[in-house]
Amino acid sequence: MRIKDVLFVKGSSGFYFDDQKAIKSGAVTDGFTYKGKPLTPGFSRVRQGGEAVSIMLFLENGEIAVGDCVAVQYSGVDGRDPVFLADNFIEVLEEEIKPRLVGYNLVRFREAARYFTNLTDKRGKRYHTALRYGLTQALLDAVAKINRTTMAEVIAEEYGLDLTLNPVPLFAQSGDDRYINADKMILKRVDVLPHGLFNHPAKTGEEGKNLTEYALWLKQRIKTLGDHDYLPVFHFDVYGTLGTVFNDNLDRIADYLARLEEKVAPHPLQIEGPVDLGSKERQIEGLKYLQEKLITLGSKVIIVADEWCNNLSDIKEFVDAGAGGMVQIKSPDLGGVNDIIEAVLYAKEKGTGAYLGGSCNETDVSAKITVHVGLATGPAQLLVKPGMGVDEGLTIMRNEMMRTLAILQRNKVTFQKKVG
């Protein structure tokens, strides 16, 4: 079926763009924003409003498919594409992408996604990850609408996957309101929590003291508020700050994490981004050493790779090297939804945990599509998004998941009746 027309509409994303380099360098908070000058190219201030561009494909059958172009909160660092400002890219979409979309005969998602994600701009470079992300979302939605099926079923059929009809564990993030938002997560029985946003050495504390105190508080809070059968996974994102407070001494970090694991037991413990060693090569070596050191200590702490692990090629390098027990597949950073699917499947095939993440700075559209990718590919966990308020993102993603599972179950029963 052909695409008759395309519209590009500027909108808002679910959070903000933050200059991580400036924050790590000591930018002082000022209400909800930060004082000081930005350090990362493309930023006009340390924190600025998140933006999105909706791509709407008008199909011959009258259906309208939608995908949202968005980028991560911490854009422009650790090998990522620059900060995504809508006004800078709508003209590119109109002049360079739209002529290729209008009249395109859309049959299968994989074929279309491969074609459009490999397009290059006038300088011969692949388009910004945000453009590829939004475009492939819209293409997936379009193929589902053409076939009158769910996006999860499109992925399963085209990639030869079995739909298990089981929910994927959801991982919510607290932001700086790590106490209030943890309460919300406990009351709503979030599977993996709380993220914590330990993105500054002062938050993590000298030799991890503040992180330990918070983890112990969280354990007790779950006993106080949680149901007796509620045992969530503890997942803390420390943005390399353990490296800062331990002077990148990986042995000391491993010892600290092994002790922390004992203190939070019986909750499983996952630590994302324990160090940021400044380059992909050093990061791979460091995370590999740290995970192996933990194993020798008899620890089951899972190290989660994030920084420097951005695109499909990066993810394969981290997985092949054993650099951590889990990789975050940060959806906007990979660009195409097709690459996201392949990344999850590759990690699972190699025995590495696949954390299908993303960013608080996404939208309801991209979050719902991530749910379908998750149901089809079966990662270890899905990040709750967009926003940092817990309830909104959890409502969007949990409800989309449960609705889709109900549809899939009904479709399965109907199919069984037909063949029976």
From Swiss-Prot:
The lineage of its organism: Bacteria, Bacillati, Bacillota, Clostridia, Thermoanaerobacterales. The record marks 195 as: Transition state stabilizer. It catalyses: (2S,3S)-3-methyl-L-aspartate = mesaconate + NH4(+). (2S,3S)-3-methyl-L-aspartate binds at residues 173, 328, 359-360. Homodimer. Pathway: Amino-acid degradation; L-glutamate degradation via mesaconate pathway; acetate and pyruvate from L-glutamate: step 2/4. It comes from Carboxydothermus hydrogenoformans (strain ATCC BAA-161 / DSM 6008 / Z-2901). One of its GO terms (molecular function) is metal ion binding. The keyword Transit peptide does not apply. The active site is at residue 330. Involved in the methylaspartate cycle. Catalyzes the formation of the alpha,beta-unsaturated bond by the reversible anti elimination of ammonia from L-threo-beta-methylaspartate (L-threo-(2S,3S)-3-methylaspartate) to give mesaconate. It can also catalyze the amination of fumarate and ethylfumarate, and the deamination of hydroxylamine, hydrazine, methylamine and ethylamine. This is Methylaspartate ammonia-lyase 1. One of its GO terms (biological process) is glutamate catabolic process via L-citramalate. It holds the Pfam family MAAL_N. Its cofactor is Mg(2+). It is an enzyme of class 4 (lyase). It comes from the Bacteria. Optimum pH is 9. Mg(2+) binds at residues 237, 272, 306. Keywords: Lyase, Magnesium, Metal-binding. The keyword Lyase applies. Belongs to the methylaspartate ammonia-lyase family. Optimum temperature is 70 degrees Celsius. It stays fully active upon incubation at 50 degrees Celsius. Even after 4 hours of incubation, the enzyme retains more than 95% of its initial activity. Its EC number is 4.3.1.2. Coiled coil: none annotated.
